[in-house]
């Protein structure tokens, strides 16, 4: 089997390459990356040691994609992954669309040409921001939590277990979310029209050692590294208390599901049979305040500034209910948050220069 991994030099791409090399005997791995993410250059030697043929190319250029050798499967792990992309001054809206949607379109033409299957890594940020902001949560014991007295089934697509795949995707979802949602739709349409398998994985917050974490993407690794180095940290919005909650997932658990998907065929043409949440779930959900408490215990106290001013697209509670993937593949995350935090902390302690790698 030959697998093409896009964004191969990123944290997720490299993690997938490592896991698939171990899981699939004789697999031929090809990677493509434009190496634009700060820190991605450091993974080139890792990929070389894994026997990955890394192509320095850009998915925005159709000619770069057309020049790639034929593969049996494509795992699309390339994206501008920030929910603030297009509005934060780092990239324009057009650049965001070209990266995320244009790149996926070129890959879909590649899959059509070579009859390759596609696994598209998407995001929890495809969901309606007003609907997410209206979820029945309140601050309890240092974190936003689902209100226990909320009637069952009173919220369409969500429960105390998290957000389900049928939650509203009505705009606004952010420019970033719109590019990923459009990519999902195109992928499903291409797969149906041209007869190749498509799986879509809407991922929660991926976290682990070696991640190039930033405040807007990779928050757990970012927070732990900055806490250890006594760099400034801020609780932004929601009163500046740090109560906002996300669930975390180790990339090895994502890789396990991807491996299962590589040897499976979608059961039916309905989108519901091909779109899955891949997240740590309610058991791995932690607030920033809880993460700080963990860091204080590990590294010693470090003051965090309070900034109550709201930031665009910030939400109090995003937890993914991944029971659809569990039902389909008997898949569950095997690494809990404390294990993930410990792994990140050990890596941070061994690599005092990591923040500089991550921030460029």
Put a short name on every predicted segment.
Residues 60, 91, 99-102, 167-170, ...:
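Residue-level signal for the nucleotide or nucleotide-sugar donor/cofactor binding architecture
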Residues 17-18, 229-360:
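C-terminal substrate-binding subdomain of Rossmann-fold SDR/epimerase-dehydratase oxidoreductases
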Residues 132-161, 185-262, 291-298:
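NAD(P)-dependent short-chain dehydrogenase/reductase
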Residues 42-44, 67, 130-134, 211-215, ...:
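Short aromatic-enriched loop/helix-cap "lid" or pocket-rim segments at secondary-structure transitions
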Residues 1-204:
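N-terminal Rossmann-like NAD(P)+-binding domain of SDR-like oxidoreductases, especially those catalyzing
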């Amino acid at each position: 089997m030959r697998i093409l991994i896009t964004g191969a030099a990123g944290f997720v791409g490299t993690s997938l390459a490592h896991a698939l090399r171990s899981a699939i005997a004789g697999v031929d791995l090809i990677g493509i990356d434009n190496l634009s993410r700060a820190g991605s250059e450091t993974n080139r030697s890792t990929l070389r040691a894994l026997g990955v043929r890394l192509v320095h190319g850009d998915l925005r250029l159709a000619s770069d994609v057309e020049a790639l050798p034929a593969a049996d499967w494509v795992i699309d792990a390339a994206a501008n992954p920030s929910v603030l992309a297009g509005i934060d001054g780092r990239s324009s809206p057009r650049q965001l669309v070209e990266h995320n949607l244009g790149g996926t379109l070129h890959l879909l033409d590649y899959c059509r040409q070579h009859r390759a299957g596609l696994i598209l890594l998407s995001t929890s940020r495809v969901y309606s921001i007003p609907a997410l902001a209206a979820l029945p949560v309140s601050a309890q014991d240092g974190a936003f939590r689902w209100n226990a007295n909320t009637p069952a089934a009173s919220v369409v697509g969500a429960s105390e277990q998290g957000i389900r795949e049928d939650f509203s995707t009505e705009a606004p979802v952010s420019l970033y979310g719109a590019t990923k949602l459009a990519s999902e739709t195109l992928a499903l349409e291409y797969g149906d029209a041209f007869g190749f398998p498509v799986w879509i994985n809407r991922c929660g917050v991926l976290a682990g050692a070696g991640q190039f974490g930033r405040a807007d993407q990779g928050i757990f690794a970012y927070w732990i590294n900055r806490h250890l180095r006594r760099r400034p940290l801020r609780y932004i919005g929601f009163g500046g208390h740090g109560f906002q909650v996300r669930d975390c997932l180790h990339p090895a658990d994502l890789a396990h599901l991807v491996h299962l998907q590589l040897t499976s065929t979608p059961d039916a043409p309905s989108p519901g049979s091909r779109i899955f949440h891949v997240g740590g779930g309610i058991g791995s959900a932690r607030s920033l305040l809880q993460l700080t408490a963990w860091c204080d215990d590990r590294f010693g106290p470090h003051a965090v500034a309070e900034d109550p001013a709201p930031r665009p697209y910030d939400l109090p509670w995003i937890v993914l209910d991944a029971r659809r993937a569990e039902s389909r593949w008997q898949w569950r995350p095997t690494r809990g948050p404390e294990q993930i935090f410990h792994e990140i902390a050990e890596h941070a302690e061994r690599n005092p220069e990591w923040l500089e790698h991550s921030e460029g």
